[in-house]
């Protein structure tokens, strides 16, 4: 069941939550709406569900105009961040709730509940109450309850946001495996870049009520459409074009109408650190080293006082043996310039000064 969004906009007073959104979610795909708070991702999900009505535009589900269709008639499964399970009902009763409301035959209901308990890997726990389950197990039950009525579309609003990091990671892998089994058209909201990249077939990056880019995790990471996307999907150094680091590199600087050169964007993984100089490297001093298991973060201050962050894998770290105060030589393997870009701050940007 595909979902098509045509020119959808939504205002809340003076605040524009969505502005001329156009999007197609292909049949059977798992799509992530990714963005910071206030980007419009949850409003778009709620509009698809029927919890918010657009001020303009059209929402088409399975070829039918659902823009003004009541939420109860859309046949959509919805999973919230905080489970919303009935505390006084057992797990079986929670899963069966939607089927019983729809007057489903008892024998069929029982069969469907057992099927879903197996699907969410909670066989044998059907007679327990929500309070007797872990957070991860409760979220699986919430998902099973949403799937019980065999919805056309599954919507998930930050489903793992209330769980700790280890459980979130386990459930991400489980959700991806589950989707590969049921092939239900699904849309989930998240502000977690890693979650979106690990789980989704396609990612919709949103900012300020607009779509910045749509693509696979690889497409968005390797070919970001804007400085916002590059900064939001992973960390990035934003450096002045006249930094000594780029004196040896031949790519042409872009200049804006006012004559200012756009900054250069380099991901921490795209720096190479050397113990000896070559023709394309510049000298710097290591200011700080942070060991993160399989990865090492190295902050380097260049001779012109430009500060950069580089990432090393374990093998590179063993070869370089980075320590604070050590002199190194650094060069970018890959650098990107966006026409019209400025050095406007963003949470995930690492600037070339003041680290």
Swiss-Prot record:
Its EC number is 7.3.2.3. It catalyses: sulfate(out) + ATP + H2O = sulfate(in) + ADP + phosphate + H(+); thiosulfate(out) + ATP + H2O = thiosulfate(in) + ADP + phosphate + H(+). GO terms for molecular function: ABC-type sulfate transporter activity; ABC-type thiosulfate transporter activity; ATP binding; ATP hydrolysis activity. GO terms for biological process: sulfate transmembrane transport. Gene3D superfamilies: P-loop containing nucleotide triphosphate hydrolases (3.40.50.300). It is found in: Cell inner membrane. Residues 3-233 form the ABC transporter domain. GO terms for cellular component: ATP-binding cassette (ABC) transporter complex. ATP binds at residues 35-42. It is a peripheral membrane protein. The keyword Cell membrane applies. Keywords: ATP-binding, Cell inner membrane, Cell membrane, Membrane, Nucleotide-binding, Sulfate transport, Translocase, Transport. CDD domains: ABC_CysA_sulfate_importer. Belongs to the ABC transporter superfamily. Sulfate/tungstate importer (TC 3.A.1.6) family. NCBIfam families: 3a0106s01 (TIGR00968). This is Sulfate/thiosulfate import ATP-binding protein CysA.
């Amino acid at each position: 069941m595909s979902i098509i969004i045509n020119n959808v906009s939504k205002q809340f007073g003076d605040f524009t939550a969505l502005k001329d959104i156009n999007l197609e979610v292909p049949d059977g795909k798992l799509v992530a709406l990714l963005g910071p708070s206030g980007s419009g991702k949850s409003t778009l999900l709620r509009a698809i569900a029927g919890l918010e009505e657009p001020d303009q535009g059209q929402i088409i589900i399975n070829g039918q105009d659902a823009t003004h269709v009541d939420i109860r008639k859309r046949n959509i499964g919805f999973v919230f961040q905080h489970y919303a399970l009935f505390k006084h009902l057992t797990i079986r009763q929670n899963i069966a709730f939607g089927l019983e409301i729809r007057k489903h035959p008892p024998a069929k209901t029982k069969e469907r509940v057992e099927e879903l308990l197996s699907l969410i890997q909670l066989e044998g726990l059907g007679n327990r109450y929500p309070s007797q389950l872990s957070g991860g197990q409760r979220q699986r039950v919430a998902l099973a309850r949403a799937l019980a009525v065999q919805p056309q579309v599954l919507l998930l609003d930050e489903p793992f946001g209330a769980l700790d990091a280890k459980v979130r990671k386990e459930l991400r892998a489980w959700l991806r495996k589950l989707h590969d089994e049921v092939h239900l058209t699904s849309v989930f909201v998240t502000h977690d870049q890693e979650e979106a990249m690990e789980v989704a077939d396609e990612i919709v990056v949103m900012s300020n009520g607009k779509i910045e880019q749509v693509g696979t995790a690889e497409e968005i990471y390797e070919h970001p459409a804007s400085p916002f996307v590059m900064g939001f999907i992973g960390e990035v150094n934003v450096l002045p074009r006249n930094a000594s680091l780029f004196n040896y590199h031949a790519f042409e600087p872009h200049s804006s109408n006012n004559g200012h050169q756009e900054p250069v964007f380099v991901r921490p993984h795209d720096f190479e650190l050397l113990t000896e100089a070559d023709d394309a490297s510049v000298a710097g001093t290591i200011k700080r080293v942070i060991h993160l298991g399989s990865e090492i973060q190295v902050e380097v201050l260049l001779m012109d006082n430009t500060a950069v962050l580089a990432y090393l894998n374990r093998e590179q770290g063993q070869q370089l043996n980075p320590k604070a105060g050590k002199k190194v030589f650094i060069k970018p393997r890959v650098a990107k310039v966006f026409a019209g870009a400025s050095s406007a701050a963003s949470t995930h940007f690492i600037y070339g000064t003041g680290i």
